[in-house]
Amino acid sequence: MSQRKPWEILIRPIITEKSNRLMEDYNKYTFEVALDASKPEIKEAVEKLFNVKVKKVNTMIVKPKKKRVWERFRQYGTTKKWKKAIVTLEKGINRHPWVCSEVRCRDGC
């Protein structure tokens, strides 16, 4: 489907308290993805990279936030906008080793 490599589509996993809760309770994994990536491309990239079956992909664009820069005078800038994807895996697939490589899990996997 896509000519891009999977690691060009998936930029990095998002590791926060909320994403960890989604991971443990609902089998959902959160990634920062390329801004122009589509849902089918994201699904294909996750399936190829991690050898799992993806049930569903939800995407959202995170708006830029204002930041203050204290140089000579008070100046304002913004962070860049980015795209977030929440990937739901099939029911039988739970807690893969690729998650533990990013964050040490309690179960010692």
From Swiss-Prot:
It comes from the Bacteria. GO terms for biological process: translation. One of its GO terms (cellular component) is ribosome. GO terms for molecular function: rRNA binding; structural constituent of ribosome. The keyword Ribosomal protein applies. Keywords: Ribonucleoprotein, Ribosomal protein, RNA-binding, rRNA-binding. InterPro entries: Nucleotide-bd_a/b_plait_sf, Ribosomal_uL23-like, Ribosomal_uL23/eL15/eS24_sf. Pfam families: Ribosomal_L23. One of the early assembly proteins it binds 23S rRNA. One of the proteins that surrounds the polypeptide exit tunnel on the outside of the ribosome. Forms the main docking site for trigger factor binding to the ribosome. Belongs to the universal ribosomal protein uL23 family. Part of the 50S ribosomal subunit. Contacts protein L29, and trigger factor when it is bound to the ribosome. This is Large ribosomal subunit protein uL23. It comes from Aquifex pyrophilus.
